[in-house]
Amino acid sequence: MKSTFSTVLITGSSKGLGYALVKVGLAQGYNVIACSRAPDTITIEHSKLLKLKLDVTDVKSVETAFKDAKRRFGNVDIVINNAGYGLVGEFESYNIEEMHRQMNVNFWGVAYITKEALNLMRESGKGGRILQISSVAGYYPSPCLSMYNASKFAVEGLSQTIMRELDPNWNIAITIVQPGGMQTEWASSNMQWAKPHPAYENDRSWRPFWENYHGCEETDPNKAAELLYSIAKLDRPPQKLVLGHDSLELIRKQHQDIGEELESNVALSTSVAKDDFDPASVETLRQNLQSM
C-alpha cells in the first residue's frame, strides 16, 4: 500500500525544515504541494511542484489548499504539519493577542489541516500518512516558552487521541515528531519575543539562553527530511519519533521524573477510592488499555 503514496503536502515550506522537505520530496519523485504564507519566496521550480498560499489559521484557506492539491494531483497521500513558530517570554509577559496567535498557528492550524487530511485519506481508500512536527517542548516544558509548550502539548494530545479513533483498515497513520534544536531560522528570524516583564528580570531568567541559542542547534534539517520520508514509507510508522540527542535526553529525564513522582504518590492517589471499590476492576482496566 505504501508504494502507491506519491503526493505530499507540506505546510511552512518556505524555509527551514519545510524547505528541506520540499527539496527532498522532489528529489525522491514525489508530487509536492508546498504551502506557505509567502509561496513566492520558494525559489524552487519543478514540474511536480505546486506552490500554494496558505494561512493555516483560516479554515477556508485550508479547504481551498486541499481542493487545489486534489485538482492538480488527484489526491494527497502524505501531509506534514510543519508550520509554526516560537513565542519567547515568561507567561506573565505575554499579552492576550500573542497568546491567541501562538495557539492559532501552532495548534489550531495543525487541527484544521489534520481534519481535512483525514477526510481526504479515508475517502480515497488508499489511506495516508500524517507527520506532526511537534517538538521536545511537547513533552519537556522549557522555561520562557509556556505558550509554545502548551501548543505542542495540545498537538500531541490531539494526535494521540486521533490515533486511537482510526480504523486500522483505513491505512492512515500519524507520527508525532519531536525535534530538539534544528539548524533553521526557528531561533532567529522565526522567533517572536514578548515584552520583558520587570518582575522576571533576574538571574533566573531564561531569556539570555534563548537569545544565544541560534547556532547551537544539533539537528541537520536535510538529514531530518530524509528520515521523515523514510518513516512515511513504512507500513507501520512509529507513533512518536524523537530527533536529536538533546531531545532524547530531555524526554528521558521528563519521563523518569514523571515516573518517580507517580510512584512516590501511589498511596495518595489511591486513598480517594470509594469504600466498596473492587480492586479487581483495575486488572480489567489494564486489559482494556492493552487492547486499545
From Swiss-Prot:
Gene Ontology MF annotations: oxidoreductase activity
Gene Ontology CC annotation, any one: cytosol
Keyword set includes Coiled coil: no
UniProt-annotated binding residues for NADP(+): L17, D55, N82, K115, Y148, K152, T184
Record localization: Cytoplasm
Keyword terms: Cytoplasm, NADP, Oxidoreductase
Keyword S-adenosyl-L-methionine listed: no
PROSITE patterns linked: ADH_SHORT
EC code(s) of this entry: 1.-.-.-
Active-site annotation: S134, Y148, K152
Name of the top EC class for this enzyme: oxidoreductase
Family statement: Belongs to the short-chain dehydrogenases/reductases (SDR) family.
PANTHER family: SHORT CHAIN DEHYDROGENASE, SHORT-CHAIN DEHYDROGENASE_REDUCTASE FAMILY PROTEIN
Protein name: Uncharacterized oxidoreductase C162.03
The species this protein was found in: Schizosaccharomyces pombe (strain 972 / ATCC 24843) (Fission yeast)
